[in-house]
């Protein structure tokens, strides 16, 4: 398939100036301390993406970099971002590029704002409309449930929560801000007492994720992943993941991926799905309309260039044939 993608892109005569913004390392925290864990994950995703894009003939890259961080060797022109200059630089760089690939959290509307700035450009990510929906876990769950996709319900009086409950930000990313409550009533009271928090029953099962390639209501399932999450007291912490670590469930997850893409047809390019493999079947927790940390080793797991797949879709190509992933483990700091 790698040869097919290269030949397709060469046939299309791709000559594309792409601006890549990884929010955490790219100046989004300029003027504020950069959380070490987020920085490490951002670096992993960014390096993998730039290497993949640079391998595509005809692509020229620019990337933003927080001016406080050491220069790093990447196949791209680097734009230093000083404090308070981030959004001005985004506007200028997006305007000068042909295509824009944002890597940013949904929280605080950051990914939505960046995606909306790409109007009139090739956005190598999901549309602002899809990002807006997926930013809210509550809105996403309701939307998916209405389309027959199994999701975690909102906690309410009368909703069964035999394993306890969790409280988390409605627009949070990953395990950030997620707390466990043995008493569902206490979880509900906490969520109702703080704006922006939601409560859900704790779903017992294995934490897993999917890496998808989406376009026009269709999805190619790239990899089925196992997440390594530790619960310390009432908090949850990501310790790493095994991309391709749940490939034995591909037959189960392929129709789920298709259902998600049909439910949110504006999803485009790489999309991550967090879920719980419960005894009753998979339960979707959230949709990430952006790169997730799994991307850092996705190409290694697939033996194919995932970014080339996205560019092929953007150039009018059809979705690639079915793929499979071998297990690749990545530990997080």
Predicted regions and their residues:
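Subset of Sec-pathway N-terminal targeting signals
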Residues: 1-15
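Nucleotide-activated donor-dependent transferases that construct or modify glycoconjugates
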Residues: 16-38
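Structural motif
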Residues: 17-19, 98-99, 224
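Short catalytic helix/loop segments, enriched in acidic residues and glycine
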Residues: 33-53
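Conserved N-proximal alpha/beta basic substrate-recognition cap immediately N-terminal to
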Residues: 52-53, 60-154
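Active-site nucleotide/adenylate-binding loops and adjacent lid/helix of ATP-dependent enzymes
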Residues: 128-207, 214-222, 239-258
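ATP-dependent carboxylate/phosphate-activation module, predominantly the ATP-grasp catalytic core
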Residues: 201-265, 270, 277, 288-314, ...
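Conserved protein kinase catalytic/activation segment
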Residues: 281-283
């Amino acid at each position: 398939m790698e040869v097919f993608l290269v030949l397709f892109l060469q046939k299309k005569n791709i000559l594309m100036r792409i601006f890549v913004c990884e929010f955490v390392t790219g100046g989004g925290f300029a003027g504020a301390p950069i959380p070490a864990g987020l920085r490490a994950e951002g670096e992993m995703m960014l390096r993998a993406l730039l290497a993949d894009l640079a391998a595509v003939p005809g692509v020229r890259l620019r990337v933003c970099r927080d001016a406080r961080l050491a220069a790093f060797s990447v196949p791209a022109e680097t734009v230093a971002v000083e404090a308070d200059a981030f959004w001005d630089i985004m506007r200028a760089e997006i305007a000068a590029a042909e295509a824009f690939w944002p890597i940013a959290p949904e929280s605080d509307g950051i990914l939505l704002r960046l995606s909306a700035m790409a109007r009139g450009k090739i956005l190598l990510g999901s549309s602002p409309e899809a990002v807006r929906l997926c930013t809210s876990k509550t809105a996403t769950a309701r939307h998916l449930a209405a389309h027959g996709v199994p999701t975690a319900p909102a906690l309410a009086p009368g909703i069964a929560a035999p394993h306890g409950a969790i409280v988390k930000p409605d627009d949070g990313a990953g395990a950030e801000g997620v707390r466990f409550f043995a008493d569902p009533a206490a979880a509900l009271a906490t969520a109702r007492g703080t704006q922006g928090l939601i409560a859900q029953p704790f779903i017992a099962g294995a934490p897993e994720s999917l890496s998808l390639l989406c376009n026009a209501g269709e999805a190619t399932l790239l990899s089925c992943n196992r997440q390594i999450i530790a619960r310390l007291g009432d908090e949850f912490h990501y310790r790493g993941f095994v991309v391709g670590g749940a490939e034995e469930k591909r037959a189960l997850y392929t129709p789920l991926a298709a259902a998600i893409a049909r439910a949110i047809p504006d999803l485009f390019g790489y999309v991550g799905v967090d879920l719980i493999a419960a005894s009753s079947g998979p339960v979707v927790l959230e949709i990430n309309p952006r790169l997730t940390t799994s991307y850092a080793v996705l190409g290694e797991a697939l033996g194919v260039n995932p970014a080339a797949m996205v560019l092929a879709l953007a150039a009018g190509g059809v979705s690639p044939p079915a793929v499979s992933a071998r297990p690749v483990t990545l530990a997080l700091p």
